[in-house]
Amino acid sequence: MVLSQEHRDLLDAFQKEVEQRRPGDLLQFAANYFNKKLEEERLFVRSQESLALSKGVVLFPGSEGCGANRAAGSPDARKTGEDEDVMFKLPFVEHDPHSRHIYDDNKHGHDSCDPHTSFSREPGAGLFQGGYNMGQEAQKEAQTDFDPKASEVSSILKQRNVPRKSGVNSKPLPMNFNAERRTSVSGETLKPDHFSDWTPENYTEKTREQLKGLESAVGKNFLFNKLDSDSKTLVINSLEEKLVSKGQEIIRQGDEGDYFYIVEKGTVDFFLDDRKVNTYGPGSCFGELALMYNSPRAVTAVAATDCVLWALDRLTFRRILLSGSFKKRLLYDDFLKSMPLLKSLSNYDRAKLADALETEYYEAGQQVISEGDVGENFYLIEYGEADVSKRGVGVVQHLKKGDYFGEVALLNDLPRQATVTATTKLKVATLGKSGFQRLLGPVVEVLRLNDPTRADKR
């Protein structure tokens, strides 16, 4: 088994702790060390959403979290679960040593969301139940409990002559039973309201020359196009320099991916099933999928020459991305709430709208839209003022903070009906055509009623 860089870093940190503390009982020290790491990670993942909720922002729409599980663990829910326990048990659970303890705990009414219940009746039982000869008393207790529901279902099955599968005599599943299925991907759950004072572990200020090259590479990559300037700078300063010798493997096909790379110097060859398929040089990037989710590497990358690479890990990137999105939601939330036009939107709809908005700046005298142009965006004024003018007529309207424009072209699929020019420094939030149709919902009808080009408005 080839360990990922993330796993190697974790083990290296543990080794340093061992060398520094020189524990007498290594096993106990290891258990305490990794339990503490797990606790810190859980605290980080489950950090409170109170700041966001106080602003009316829904960070993770549709996610019920452990609250839903506790509700499901109520007496009524458990009763329903017991009725279905035997007939609808997962088909592979009997052969899975990792899931056996979950079944046993649920049978005894344990709440799987409570971190304290994972440390159960016997030392180590919560961590090592099932299949590994640990926590045996807990397993025996689960096996000797009399389940009247199971007996009742058994008698029904016998009457119908339906053979009942035995977990004792069943043959274990073959190791490659899932080999032809599509590989799954995953990603960590993060809570961005915990990031206020967070600094990336590998944060280092880059030189002007390094910044120039890295900004060019980052700027043309689709993952970073929508980041604001502060987030882009944070990404660049979080990149870690890696020196790779000629012939050294950088990533291996099928391995877990957790790093994104930018080539500063040298060339990298890519192989698919031992067949060379591509070569990248300075300024190129690879490994983008690793920043989005934990997916296996699609190819093998080998340094064709000595290389200087810059690497960014997935967790750092996602923290930067979510921190920026979180701040953006908080920033736009009060602004969107203050607009009479958007009062009909729910908190959830406002959160989605805030995510889709982009910020643009204009200096006094600069045109935002021009009469006759194709309309692609809807605009909301965050601060500043602008004039609306028409050819042959002159200025027809003056706009200020909280006003909007650009809706006519999107509502009626027409060219721009007027020119909007900034009269002071202007900051606007823009929404693209697809977002306008998809996210504004009932607001679109209000805009139609106020459309100045309507026949009954003339």
Swiss-Prot record:
Keyword Repeat: yes
Binding site for 3',5'-cyclic AMP 2: 341-457
Gene (name only): PKAR
Quaternary structure and partners: Tetramer, composed of 2 regulatory (R) and 2 catalytic (C) subunits. In the presence of cAMP it dissociates into 2 active monomeric C subunits and an R dimer.
Protein name: cAMP-dependent protein kinase regulatory subunit
Entries under SUPFAM superfamilies matching the protein: cAMP-binding domain-like, Dimerization-anchoring domain of cAMP-dependent PK regulatory subunit
Modified residues (Phosphoserine): S184
GO terms (BP aspect): adenylate cyclase-activating G protein-coupled receptor signaling pathway; cellular response to glucose starvation; cellular response to nitrogen starvation; negative regulation of Ras protein signal transduction; positive regulation of protein export from nucleus; positive regulation of transcription by RNA polymerase II; protein localization to bud neck; regulation of cytoplasmic mRNA processing body assembly
GO molecular function, one term: protein kinase A catalytic subunit binding
Binding site for 3',5'-cyclic AMP 1: 223-338
Disulfide bond listed as a keyword: no
Keywords: cAMP, cAMP-binding, Nucleotide-binding, Phosphoprotein, Repeat
InterPro entries in the record: cAMP-dep_PK_reg_su-like, cAMP_dep_PK_reg_su, cAMP_dep_PK_reg_su_I/II_a/b, cNMP-bd_CS, cNMP-bd_dom, cNMP-bd_dom_sf, RmlC-like_jellyroll
GO cellular component: cAMP-dependent protein kinase complex; chromatin; cytosol; nucleus; plasma membrane
Disulfide bonds: none
Pfam families: cNMP_binding (PF00027), RIIa (PF02197)
Region spans: Dimerization and phosphorylation: 28-222
Organism annotation: Eremothecium gossypii (strain ATCC 10895 / CBS 109.51 / FGSC 9923 / NRRL Y-1056) (Yeast)
Family in the record: Belongs to the cAMP-dependent kinase regulatory chain family.
Gene3D superfamilies, A to Z: cAMP-dependent protein kinase regulatory subunit, dimerization-anchoring domain, Jelly Rolls
